[in-house]
Structure formats: structure tokens, C-alpha cells
């Protein structure tokens, strides 16, 4: 299996193969997931002090906060997969 990476903003890159979901941080259950990850030391804040717009949940139970919209991250992920299929 080939390792694929995706830019989540400000030069931060994560492994696309390990992403479980990309969600908005607005709902109470997601806020709870963020809080629990912070308590467990599994939270990665990649916002550079800006507002959190996307929460990326990884298969390793890490939770990553991004300042990029969830739709943008998903689009980058889909674009990357489509480019690789064409080669």
C-alpha cells in the first residue's frame, strides 16, 4: 500500500490513508471528542491560533484540529486520489 499525504493547512501534512473522518467542530459530540482527546494527550492542534474549522479523526485515535474547512480537506483528499488513478 502506498502512503498518501494531504495538506491540512499552513504546511501541515497528515497521512491520508489513516483518516477515518473529517467533521465540523460545531456539534456537542465532536466537542466532547476534542475534550477527551485533549485529556488523553491525543489532540494535535494544527490551527496556528486560528479558528478550528475541521476536526480530523485518525485511526490511531488522534484528533487533529485544522483551520481549513472540512469540504476543502475532503476535496484535497479526493483530488489526490483521482490524480493517482490517472497515472
Curated annotation (Swiss-Prot):
Superkingdom of the organism of origin: Bacteria
Any Pfam family: RemA-like
Record InterPro entries: RemA-like
Signal peptide start-end: none
HAMAP family reported for this sequence: RemA
Family: Belongs to the RemA family.
Protein name from the UniProt record: Putative regulatory protein CHY_1489
